[in-house]
UniProtKB/Swiss-Prot annotation:
InterPro entries: Acyl_CoA_acyltransferase, GNAT_dom, MshD_Acetyltransferase. PANTHER family: L-AMINO ACID N-ACETYLTRANSFERASE, N-ALPHA-ACETYLTRANSFERASE RIMI. Keywords: Acyltransferase, Host-virus interaction, Inhibition of host innate immune response by virus, Restriction-modification system evasion by virus, Transferase, Viral immunoevasion. The keyword Membrane does not apply. One of its GO terms (molecular function) is protein-N-terminal-alanine acetyltransferase activity. Acetylates 5-aminomethyl-2'-deoxyuridine (5-NmdU) to produce 5-acetylaminomethyl-2'-deoxyuridine (5-AcNmdU) on DNA as a step in the pathway leading to thymidine hypermodifications in the viral genome. As a final result of the pathway of hypermodification, 5-acetylaminomethyl-2'-deoxyuridine (5-AcNmdU) substitutes for a subset of thymidines in the viral DNA. These modifications probably prevent degradation of viral genome by the host restriction-modification antiviral defense system. This is 5-NmdU N-acetyltransferase.
């Protein structure tokens, strides 16, 4: 069974381990976000547990001045790929955020992620990340 819940500050090392397994992550200078207690207290970080172990996570932020939620990171442990955790994480975002628009950037070279977002109905809005990525969105 897959359970998605708010992450706890003391779980940041486990979340970083999953994040480091993810393809095409930048140098992970943003790991500060994962060790910031504020990010946990505000509910920006959630985890997906499978068989009692953290196997996936996401980090979002709901914009104040625009009616959208930004997905900064999503990751699934290599050994948990194919179990539906990524889909469950996206569904959780859609069910729990106040905005009805989710935006994200994906590396153009990451065919696995691009196929994943395509299956979930995301639309390409244009290029991002200095031409290395694509800006995607989904509305519901």
């Amino acid at each position: 069974m897959i359970v998605v819940r708010k992450a706890l500050p003391e779980e940041h090392k486990e979340i970083l381990q999953v994040a480091k397994q993810s393809k095409y992550t930048k140098d992970f200078s943003n790991q500060v976000m994962f060790s910031s207690e504020a990010a946990y207290n505000k509910g920006w970080i959630h985890v997906a547990e499978h068989e009692g172990e953290i196997r996936g996570f996401y980090c979002i932020r709901e914009k104040v001045r625009a009616p959208e939620t930004v997905l900064y990171f999503i990751g699934v442990a290599q050994e948990a790929k194919g179990l539906g955790l990524g889909k469950k994480l996206i569904e959780h975002i859609m069910a729990t955020t106040r905005h009805r628009r989710l935006t994200l950037n994906v590396n153009k070279q990451n065919e696995e992620a691009r196929a994943f977002y395509d299956r979930l109905g995301f639309t390409v809005a244009g290029e991002s990340l200095g031409g290395e990525g694509l800006a995607l969105f989904k509305e519901w």
